Amino acid sequence: MKSSLLAASLMSLAGAASADHPSGDRYLTPQFSAGQNYSNVFSILRSIKADGYDEHASRNGGSADYSILSASNDGWVTRAKGRYDGQASGDDSVEFRDNGRTYCQLNAGGKTSCNAYLEGSGLTYNATIWGVPPKQLVQGMSWTVDVKQAWELGGSNGTEKVTVVSVDAATDTAILLREGASEGFYSESDAHTVQLTHDGHTETLEVKPGTSHWKGYTTFVKGVVFSDELVVTRQDLLVSKSGSSVNATERRVMLLNAAPFPTL
């Protein structure tokens, strides 16, 4: 076969493969434009069980509304209104950079404060938690992510495996499974002490966190989270003021779903 014909044949095969497996950007990169609106609702349940103590359980939840103000190839600016029920609501202009890895807020005095986005879930795909996906998504494929920083539902030096459960090119929908493990305290809402009840008496115990394990499904539609659930368990050691200790299992169940705009 002549080189020109061979090149044409290879290009044709590459085009066919690309058509069969569209770019991962279609599924996992948001295609925002100014004027679009989104909302989600969310909750996190936390429970701690230790022998000899009453189980402690608490839950918080709320909703958030997003109005896209501007968008570029690797970032976007949104007005974000959010509320955890029972707490004060927030209303801020937030810029997401680096395809969602970094968020920046305009503080009083006109100064911008930027931080890594380390939430367990959110409006969009976040490569800090999910890793950089392959150029093309195929059902059954997987990749590994090193989550070095502690985040909302995991400790530091974590490792996570992401598996493509299914893709639907007709709706630009991808379902991913994430499963991982880490060590130590989480980045937020993770107190170093806990109060548990024993024989009718409340006792304050020091928390020494061990290994966490998480697993859950997330559905993305054009890069936006449509539904997300994650179950996290961690083995802790609780130490009393007298120095005695007891093993404990801590569990968190996170749920986030897209909702009709607005919720607030």
Report each predicted region and the residues it spans.
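Extracytoplasmic beta-rich ectodomain segments of secreted or membrane-anchored proteins
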Residues: 121-165
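Acidic, serine/threonine-rich low-complexity disordered tracts
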Residues: 20-98, 147-264
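N-terminal signal peptide c-region/cleavage motif recognized by signal peptidases
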Residues: 14-16
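An acidic-aromatic
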Residues: 82-120
